[in-house]
C-alpha cells in the first residue's frame, strides 16, 4: 500500500484550484440512469470512488466515454443489466445510489449491500422503506437487495425517521419517474442534494422545495439528457483552509464557493483566521499566528459537517487553549484520536466528545489512516509536527482527495508519496 511521507514545520502558502465534489458527482452519475438520452457530466474529480461508479455503470451496460472537454459522457440507452454486483459495490457505499433510479426506470434492481469507510453503521433501512412506500416489493437475500416494481413506482408521502443524505438522494431519484406526487419529509438539505436536484430539473424533473427539508416531486414520464457541471467540493475546500490555519499559513482557493461552507468558515474565524471571500475564491491568512481552540458539534446541514470534524480535531491539537469536539452523526468518527495522541496530542475521549488541550507542536510518527477524513487529519497533523510523519493506508485519502500531495506541494509542504 502507498504511504505519504511528510516533513513537518512548513507554513502553508500559495494558491490551488478546488476539484469537483465527489459527494455530488456520485449521485449525479447514478441519476444518469434515469435519462433516455446521453448525459455530459463536467467537473468530476479524478478519484477512486468516481472511477468505481463509472465501472459500475459500464458493468450495467451503460456507455461511458471521456470527451474532448474532459467531461464524462454517459449513455444510459445501452443498459443491459439492472444488477450492481458485489465485486464493485463492496468498495464503495455510494453504489447503493443506483437502486432508486434503476428501479424507477426499469421496474427492477438487484444491488449488493455496500462497503466503503469503516465509520459506524450506515443502515439503508430508510432507503428501502421509502421505496416500499412507493409500491416497490423488496427482498433481501444472499447479500443483495432485490427490488421489484413491475407496474412502476407510485407517488407517496414519506417521512424519514432521521436525516439521511443517501436516503434522500435515492428516494428523490426514484420519485422523479413515479406516477403522481411524492412528498419527502425530514429530507437532508446538504448542498450536494441541491446539486443533484438541480441536475434532475435540468433533465426535466419537477421538484419543489429544493434546499428545504420538504421535497415535493411531481413524477414525469421521461427525463432527457443534459450537460451538467458538478459543484465544487466543500469538504476539500474546508480541508485546505484548516491545513493553512493549523500551520499558521495562508492560502487562496479557486473555483469554490463560500455559501456552502458557512458553519466551517465561522469556526475558522473563531480560530483567528482572516478570511476574504470572492465570487469563486476563498482566501485565508493566519499571519503566522497559532490558531485558537474552538468548540464544535457536528449535525446535519446547515450545521457543522461531520466530514470536517477530523480536520478541526487536528487543528485543535496544536491550538491555544482547550476545545471540545462532539460527533453526533457517526459513532466511530473519533478513531483518529489515538493516532494524534501518539504524535503528542493531549486528547481525552468522553463518549462521543473529544476534549482537546492544545500543545505547541506535535511530534512526527508513523500513523495509520482508518477512514477518508481521519486520514486527512493525520496529514494535517504531519504538517504541524516536528520531524517526519509517515501516513499508511492512504487508499482512504485517494477516495476523497484529488492529487492531495501535488496540491500540498504547490502550497510548499514537504510531502511525497511512496509506493507500497
Curated annotation (Swiss-Prot):
Pfam families: EPSP_synthase (PF00275). Phosphoenolpyruvate binds at residues 22-23. UDP-N-acetyl-alpha-D-glucosamine binds at residues 93, 307, 329. The keyword Glycoprotein does not apply. It catalyses: phosphoenolpyruvate + UDP-N-acetyl-alpha-D-glucosamine = UDP-N-acetyl-3-O-(1-carboxyvinyl)-alpha-D-glucosamine + phosphate. Gene3D superfamilies: Enolpyruvate transferase domain. One of its GO terms (biological process) is UDP-N-acetylgalactosamine biosynthetic process. Pathway: Cell wall biogenesis; peptidoglycan biosynthesis. Its EC number is 2.5.1.7. The modification 2-(S-cysteinyl)pyruvic acid O-phosphothioketal is found at residue 117. Keywords: Cell cycle, Cell division, Cell shape, Cell wall biogenesis/degradation, Cytoplasm, Peptidoglycan synthesis, Pyruvate, Transferase. The keyword Amino-acid biosynthesis does not apply. PANTHER family: UDP-N-ACETYLGLUCOSAMINE 1-CARBOXYVINYLTRANSFERASE (PTHR43783:SF1). This is UDP-N-acetylglucosamine 1-carboxyvinyltransferase. It comes from Teredinibacter turnerae (strain ATCC 39867 / T7901). The gene is murA.
